[in-house]
């Protein structure tokens, strides 16, 4: 499959054509121009070429992800200002359900109790008299459930969007979701209806041979390997591999649990920037599951990522092959350690892992504002096209 990060154009130049070939070249160019013109005339107009603004779209976020028990609601983002997406009217108030063209459902909140889906597919909250002693997630949960129970049938044309950024290994309750409830999927999977990766590379506007920050100053890199891990589990492949690797090379561990040193999130990038390598080890291995561990923790910090996740081919759909080191490239943890030590002694070879920065820069997705706005944009582009997801679990767990 074609890489999604793109490639630079071929370099121009070369010897001139002999005179005898000029006529043939002119004829070829003329026929090519006609073909291109015909193809271009058959293309639909580009979104930004339309003089009319996109139609306003109302998008309701049914649960605010990871809001917490006592945290106040965050105001919806300004999609125009943040992401240059106009025509979006975003809501967290369920009173807007009837007018919403799309409703976003975050999977983790979807499957944990108490259930309060909108009708008619959702299992509603029990009556008030049956809810004594029920533990609410926050003070507003009960009021929201009562609002849900008062809602009418699903409005015609309304799209339900299943949103999830966890891997199948950490997405319980998938089998309990009936088919054809949702119209669209929104996730890190490239085959989602709304593809929202944790990050991506984009071409620099003005590529140069030495853009600022191309190669972080090696003098600042006082450590060799760093790893930030939030949930320590000895059963995970990433912990088992760390146990092997740390026998041959020093790995400084940060985060909660295990041997890690506490590290505030605000200090993560600054801390990792002092290391040459970063273990971008995912908590599970699944198709396209490449998280902020690569995009923010490694790339933004200016460390070379050592990845453990999907296979190398999957990574190369999104980043150049020389931008990372994959554990699968080595027969053992000891051979990987030897390679890292070799790169530590050879700065010229090490700098080769930063060559891609000459042409591309890193974008890290802004959760949860960016997916919300992208869902709005998807509704605008889809028009009246209809679809549903017949087997959500079967698709996501493949």
Curated annotation (Swiss-Prot):
Coiled coil: none annotated. Residues 1-15 are cytoplasmic. It comes from the Eukaryota. Its EC number is 2.4.1.152. One of its GO terms (biological process) is inflammatory response. It catalyses: a beta-D-galactosyl-(1->4)-N-acetyl-beta-D-glucosaminyl derivative + GDP-beta-L-fucose = a beta-D-galactosyl-(1->4)-[alpha-L-fucosyl-(1->3)]-N-acetyl-beta-D-glucosaminyl derivative + GDP + H(+); an N-acetyl-alpha-neuraminyl-(2->3)-beta-D-galactosyl-(1->4)-N-acetyl-beta-D-glucosaminyl derivative + GDP-beta-L-fucose = an alpha-Neu5Ac-(2->3)-beta-D-Gal-(1->4)-[alpha-L-Fuc-(1->3)]-beta-D-GlcNAc derivative + GDP + H(+); an alpha-Neu5Ac-(2->3)-beta-D-Gal-(1->4)-beta-D-GlcNAc-(1->3)-beta-D-Gal-(1->4)-beta-D-GlcNAc derivative + GDP-beta-L-fucose = an alpha-Neu5Ac-(2->3)-beta-D-Gal-(1->4)-beta-D-GlcNAc-(1->3)-beta-D-Gal-(1->4)-[alpha-L-Fuc-(1->3)]-beta-D-GlcNAc derivative + GDP + H(+); an alpha-Neu5Ac-(2->3)-beta-D-Gal-(1->4)-beta-D-GlcNAc6S derivative + GDP-beta-L-fucose = an alpha-Neu5Ac-(2->3)-beta-D-Gal-(1->4)-[alpha-L-Fuc-(1->3)]-beta-D-GlcNAc6S derivative + GDP + H(+). Residues 41-398 are lumenal. Keywords: Glycoprotein, Glycosyltransferase, Golgi apparatus, Inflammatory response, Membrane, Signal-anchor, Transferase, Transmembrane, Transmembrane helix. Glycans are attached at residues 84, 183, 311. Its main location: Golgi. It holds the Pfam family Glyco_transf_10. It is an enzyme of class 2 (transferase). The chain crosses the membrane at residues 16-40. Pathway: Protein modification; protein glycosylation. InterPro entries: Glyco_tran_10_C, Glyco_tran_10_N, Glyco_trans_10, GT10-like_C_sf. GO terms for cellular component: Golgi cisterna membrane; trans-Golgi network. It is a single-pass type II membrane protein. It is found in: Golgi apparatus, Golgi stack membrane. GO terms for molecular function: 4-galactosyl-N-acetylglucosaminide 3-alpha-L-fucosyltransferase activity; alpha-(1->3)-fucosyltransferase activity. Catalyzes alpha(1->3) linkage of fucosyl moiety transferred from GDP-beta-L-fucose to N-acetyl glucosamine (GlcNAc) within type 2 lactosamine (LacNAc, Gal-beta(1->4)GlcNAc) glycan attached to N- or O-linked glycoproteins. Robustly fucosylates nonsialylated distal LacNAc unit of the polylactosamine chain to form Lewis X antigen (CD15), a glycan determinant known to mediate important cellular functions in development and immunity. Belongs to the glycosyltransferase 10 family. This is Alpha-(1,3)-fucosyltransferase 4.
